Amino acid sequence: MTNKGWRAALVISAGIGLSFNASAGFKVVALGVNGGVEEGNLTSYLIRSDDQTRYVGLDAGSVLPGIGKALEKSSFPDITAENSAPLTPKGAVFRNLISAYFISHGHLDHLAGLIIASPQDSKKPIYGSAETIDTLRQYYFNWKVWPNFSDSGSGQRLGTYRLNAPRPEQRFSLGLSGLDGVIYPLSHGGVSSSMLLVSRNNESFAYFGDTGADKLEKSRHLDAVWRVLGNEIKQKRLKGLIIETSFTNQMPENQLFGHLTPALLLGELKNLEGYAGGEGSLKGLKVVISHIKPSLTAGADPRAEIHHQLEQNNHLGVNFLFMQQGDSLEF
């Protein structure tokens, strides 16, 4: 990693928002960055175009706690108590700035925040694969687990959320955000997951839900995604991506359950490099590492270990970034 990259990673790890590019195309805010265990900091990000004000939620494991932390870190500098009234600043971001959600798959650590906060949310669409939308409809918004705040499914339909399952690999509009999206399937230990390619103004950003490596999943889903992103890189459109690395390299492959390690991620990114133009084509690519699973073992620091293992073998020149809850970045 370059000196600039190391400084960026250190600043982000300290919890300070940072802009790398004066002509940034997207702003990303981390509402939650962990891959489980602690319910207040679960996977959830916001993204918007730099010429728009409304965000799309990228998963929703922890929403309101993350908004609170982001406000503390001035990640929403235009939101004040005065211009939020009669709402709180947290309420203004939640109800007014988040215009839509994309849910990558139906696991609880990716949507618990949306479910819990739904009674006070404003009307907005939720996008996901057909499998994800069906999971929301059947197993969450069903008046057994939770009241039905959607516009379909069983019992009274309260209609806060419009459930949408766009066709895979076809472009659609992401609510009122001004962003377009395309959903691609991923494999997550036998569970259907997905990646969202966000685009606007001939620029793009990729958000990955949970995924295992193709060789372990007996799948070609990541290979298909790398082909798409390789072309985005060749066309100089891809501004960055968020992808999981849940475990350190010490985790046995038969205990990954559809997740990545640093070694597996680097192997997959090597495949992307081939589609992006060959050696050196990923140099400087900003890759946010997400979904690290915290440990309850004394002295263990999986975040630091994953960071070390990625950098130790980073022969691709990728700029690995580690956001903390509440941080914002421009791409």
Label for each model-derived stretch:
Residues 44-48, 165-234:
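Catalytic core of the metallo-beta-lactamase
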Residues 1-10:
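Bacterial N-terminal signal peptides that target proteins for export
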Residues 89-156:
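Active-site HxH/HxHxD metal-binding segment of metal-dependent hydrolases
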Residues 214-324:
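Cap/insert and terminal regions of metallo-dependent hydrolase folds
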Residues 57-61, 97-109, 127-129, 207-210, ...:
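Active-site neighborhood of phospho(di)ester-bond hydrolases with catalytic His/Asp-centered motifs
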Residues 37-102, 106, 112-119, 217, ...:
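Pre-active-site segment of Zn-dependent metallo-hydrolases
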Residues 131-193, 315-329:
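Metallo-beta-lactamase
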Residues 19-22:
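N-terminal signal peptide c-region/cleavage motif recognized by signal peptidases
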